[in-house]
């Protein structure tokens, strides 16, 4: 998510 950490950002986001 946008408010999540970079690790999660590159996960669910992509």
Swiss-Prot record:
Tissue specificity: Corpora alata and to a lesser extent in abdominal perisympathetic organs.
Protein family according to the UniProt entry: Belongs to the pyrokinin family.
Residue positions where Leucine amide is found in the record: 14
GO cellular component terms listed in the entry, alphabetical order: extracellular region
Compartments, record wording: Secreted
Protein name in the entry: Pyrokinin-6
Highest taxon in the source lineage: Eukaryota
